[in-house]
């Protein structure tokens, strides 16, 4: 059980919400603020004075006054008309994060929503009744309207859900959770819809995957150093301390730790080779830069996870209703775009190491890592697959945040595209996973070919894991299943856990 303290969520909590079957409860200390916000909205609605989002239309229709007897209909219509998402359902892990983030935002007491509505969301979450949310349809301002409308429609008994993974109607989902359809009061529909929770959830969910890939890439890169009989001298701490970048210093330390005591490395310590290619030698510089970007993105996304991104905002202590733009997800878009650059670069560097290993003139290994080259092609086309994926990632890494299209009759004339920026991270991460799987296979093959010398004590379990699932490549065979089984192990963090390094979300 995780107790949500609105405004004080942590990255480890968010990772657990996404990755584990934890349940949620709301910190009772938040109840007074929630109740005060709801009362403030009820008082404003009772007075009948125009207040945006409470008794007016929305967007370009903000100047249209809504009579008091139509306020409930206004909120219902808002939810139903905005549930216009398309595409595949959002991943279960992202939906869980989305609901938790929405609860945190509402729980800070500036949205004017009743606890009854929040309790219904928690009940659905804990019953594993998750809204079916189409993943496409948000431009990241005014908030993530369409995705959050699909979440909110379930509270009304409209739409679809997944009941413990099985697709069903919203009404069936409410019944399983022991709930009845809600009637939303003034502003409650808008409070549910307005916010950056979809883009932030997608960005966080994919960031956690990219963090795992980063750690896997450290391991794969270190194994490739041994496979290529590379030097460990470029990882000397003194080099990196002179430059001063924290990520670079930390990455170099990880490579030193992983390669410490390698018999392969000791066997060629006194060779006449002067310098390794950049894909080996400059790993701390490249991976360190990726690490710095990822850490900054995590800081931004944690702030956003704890933010109130509703509009308008209710200030119960003064009774004021202030319209602003906290729904504009530009910080999320920038963070996601930076994560895309890092994830694509992790894959790009791994692809270069694969290319190095299969090139006999660079690695000193048999061409394409196989004996009897010619009749056997070995890793030749596996590298082509890695190259295809790395190239695709370069296109996917183009920033989404530089684009904008005006909506709502030019009332909402600049948008963030944060949801797309966050969503495409999943494709980049998936591609990078397969690139790393191919590198792990190639590096393991190279290490085998360095016999009788072995890799380091820290990397020996990696070799054992790989060889426990895929045999040494002797002759050409149907190769795709080998890549698939190692990619599955990458997804399961089998190699990431070997890296002597952890992110804030894992602590």
Curated annotation (Swiss-Prot):
It is found in: Cytoplasm. Pathway: Amino-acid degradation; L-histidine degradation into L-glutamate; N-formimidoyl-L-glutamate from L-histidine: step 1/3. It catalyses: L-histidine = trans-urocanate + NH4(+). PROSITE patterns: PAL_HISTIDASE. Transmembrane segments: none annotated. There is a cross-link at residues 141-143 (5-imidazolinone (Ala-Gly)). Disulfide bonds: none annotated. One of its GO terms (cellular component) is cytoplasm. SUPFAM superfamilies: L-aspartase-like. It is an enzyme of class 4 (lyase). Its EC number is 4.3.1.3. One of its GO terms (biological process) is L-histidine catabolic process to glutamate and formate. Signal peptide: none annotated. Keywords: Cytoplasm, Histidine metabolism, Lyase. GO terms for molecular function: histidine ammonia-lyase activity. NCBIfam families: hutH, PRK09367.1. This is Histidine ammonia-lyase. It comes from Burkholderia ambifaria (strain ATCC BAA-244 / DSM 16087 / CCUG 44356 / LMG 19182 / AMMD) (Burkholderia cepacia (strain AMMD)).
């Amino acid at each position: 059980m995780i107790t949500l303290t609105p405004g004080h969520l942590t990255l480890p909590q968010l990772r657990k919400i996404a990755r584990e079957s934890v349940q949620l409860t709301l910190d009772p200390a938040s109840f007074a603020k929630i109740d005060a916000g709801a009362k403030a909205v009820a008082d404003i609605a009772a007075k009948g004075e125009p207040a945006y989002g409470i008794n007016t239309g929305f967007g370009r229709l903000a100047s249209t006054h809504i009579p008091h007897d139509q306020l409930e209909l206004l909120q219902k219509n808002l939810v139903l008309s905005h549930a216009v998402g398309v595409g595949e359902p959002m991943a279960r892990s992202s939906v869980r994060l989305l609901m938790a983030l929405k609860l945190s935002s509402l729980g800070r007491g500036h949205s004017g929503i009743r606890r009854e509505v929040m309790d219904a969301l928690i009940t659905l979450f804990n019953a594993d009744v998750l809204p079916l949310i189409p993943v496409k349809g948000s431009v990241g301002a005014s908030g993530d309207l369409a995705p959050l409308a699909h979440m909110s429609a379930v509270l009304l008994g409209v739409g679809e859900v997944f009941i413990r993974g099985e697709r069903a109607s919203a009404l069936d989902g409410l019944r399983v959770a022991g709930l009845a359809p809600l009637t939303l009061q003034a502003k409650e529909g808008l409070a549910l819809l307005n916010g950056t929770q979809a883009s932030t959830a997608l960005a966080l969910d994919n960031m956690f995957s990219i963090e795992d890939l980063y750690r896997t890439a450290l391991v794969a890169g270190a194994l490739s150093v041994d496979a290529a009989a590379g030097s460990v001298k470029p990882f000397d701490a003194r080099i990196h301390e002179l430059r001063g970048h924290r990520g670079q210093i930390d990455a170099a330390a990880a490579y030193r730790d992983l390669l410490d005591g390698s018999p392969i490395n000791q066997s060629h310590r006194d060779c006449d080779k002067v310098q390794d290619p950049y894909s080996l030698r400059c790993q701390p510089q490249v991976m360190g830069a990726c690490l710095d970007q990822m850490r900054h993105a995590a800081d931004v996304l944690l702030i956003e996870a704890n933010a109130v991104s509703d509009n308008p905002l209710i200030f119960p202590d003064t009774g004021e209703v202030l319209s602003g733009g906290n729904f504009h997800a530009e910080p999320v878009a920038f963070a996601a775009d930076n994560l895309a650059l890092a994830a694509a670069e992790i894959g790009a560097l791994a692809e270069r190491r694969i290319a190095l290993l299969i090139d006999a003139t660079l690695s000193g290994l048999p061409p394409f890592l196989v004996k009897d080259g010619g009749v056997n092609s070995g890793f030749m086309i596996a590298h082509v697959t890695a190259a295809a994926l790395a190239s695709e990632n370069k296109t996917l890494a183009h920033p989404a945040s530089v684009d904008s299209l005006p909506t709502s009759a030019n009332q909402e004339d600049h948008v963030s595209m944060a949801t797309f920026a966050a969503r495409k991270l999943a494709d980049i991460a998936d591609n990078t996973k397969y690139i790393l799987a191919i590198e792990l296979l190639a590096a393991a093959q190279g290490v085998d070919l360095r016999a009788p010398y072995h890799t380091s004590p820290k990397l020996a379990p990696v070799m054992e894991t790989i060889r426990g699932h895929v045999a040494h490549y002797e002759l050409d065979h149907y190769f795709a299943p080998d890549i698939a089984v190692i990619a599955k192990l990458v997804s399961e963090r089998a190699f990431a856990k070997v890296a002597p390094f952890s992110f804030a979300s894992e602590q």
